[in-house]
Amino acid sequence: MAQYVYSMHRVGKIVPPNRHILKNISLSFFPGAKIGVLGLNGAGKSTLLRIMAGVDTDIEGEARPQPGLKVGYLPQEPQLDESKDVRGNIEEAVADVKHALTRLDEVYAEYAAPDADFDALAKEQGELEAIIQAKDGHNLENALERAADALRLPPWDADVSKLSGGERRRVALCRLLLEKPEMLLLDEPTNHLDAESVAWLERFLHDYEGTVVAITHDRYFLDNVAGWILELDRGEGIPWEGNYSSWLEQKENRLQQEERAETARMKSMKQELEWVRSNPKGRHAKSKARMARFEELSTSDYQKRNETNELFIPPGERLGDKVIEVSNLKKSYGDRVLIDDLSFKVPKGAIVGIVGPNGAGKSTLFRMLTGAEQPDSGNIDLGETVQIAAVEQFRDHMNENNTVWKEISDDSDIIRIGNFEINSRAYCSRFNFKGTDQQKFIKDLSGGERNRVHLAKLLKAGGNVLLLDEPTNDLDVETLRALENALLEFPGCAMVISHDRWFLDRVATHIMDYRDEGNINFFEGNYSDYETWLKNEFGQDVVEPHRLKYKRMSK
């Protein structure tokens, strides 16, 4: 086997207006290496993967795989064949095996022909059996079902043209994994996966024989899969050997030599350090490694790196003792029961993390809490002081030609939030849009930057109960940390739909978990506490992902 499977020599990329997003990157990739790509939003991570996949060839320098290397690429918006159903798209990955199985049956039949050429048939039989054996073709059907369950795919016969963006990504990811290319390039593979599917993907990629290069901000994923971290910092590619925790330790040695540190960053890191030190003994070993996070950003140049040190969640009116009380709630769509007899109370000061498969009804619960939808039966009782601010998952309802400042401020110099007023440019800066960044057009923003604009817009309402639908999607690790700290300092309550287990471990006081057939668990504790309880109560199999089972309406 070649020493390197992929090489980059002095690779650079210029984007409008004449900005070097990548510059002078020279890297070689080992066979079987597992590499996590980290960097701030807009640092060029997706651009790097497009270059490696051969999609973007307008570059400086040279990027090339070893001759004959099979490279598989998952972009953020993958293409599917809409003339085929879900199964048809998945089977594209194993077309050679299916053809070999069909042809092998024909070869067996041809042996019985009076004029059969036994030598030619035996040779072809050997070639076909080699193809089948290489991909475990005799267990093909089981492999398809296991992968479909693990990634919670839609039904096999589902119309691909009607799938949501998340469903399309899961189908594309499943197809790519079944292809088993020698090199996988994955752009945010954990997006639109629930926590159990992410855990399955971790195990799959950890054991994968090929090379994996993955952009992800899932910090447990980076800890459990990556053997290398490739950090993109101001256009440069910096490789670090080790997983996420190891990267933090190594980076500490570089950063601690610098003396300057911003007050906001130190405050942020101290808060996370306190959380790390308070971890249960069962996670002590990992916690010790993660204490290096305290030093990670303490001395780097803030203006150059443009990190999000703080996010600002405007406080609403003072929240009373009664927040949200739900009793005997039921909700169905068609003949599918999404929520069956749900009862829970959100106590004052709680942060409820909501987990479960896509399509289980998590966003539906939010719409019922805001009154946008009505339950089939049951009661939702909100406290008299409750003011809900809802931040939905879909962030495309923005004017692409607006600047950041105009989109957030509605062209007003003053923003009124609750009982106080704030200068609109100062408000934008609290979401880390400072100086000329406020004049960026929405159409030119990265996914994480769009997310921050969306948060800034929706949080102007100044509610004291936040409903956050996948707020962690597309955020870099620095912004994730800032959001965690903002939630921990928020004086009200929050209910947060998220699949980010680190995020849920750090901020959640309660977990709401959507299970099969409309059943929902409500647990006091963070995600790791809940997962431990679930395994102890029901065994390891209960946390293995599978296609969601819906309860049917009784007639």
Question: What do the PLM-derived regions correspond to, one by one?
Answer:
Residues 272-281, 295, 309-316, 322-325:
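Alpha-helical coupling/stalk and coiled-coil linker elements that connect catalytic or binding modules
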Residues 250-293, 297-304:
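Intracellular alpha-helical coupling/juxtamembrane segments of multi-pass membrane proteins
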Residues 1-263, 307, 313-555:
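ABC ATP-binding cassette signature C-motif
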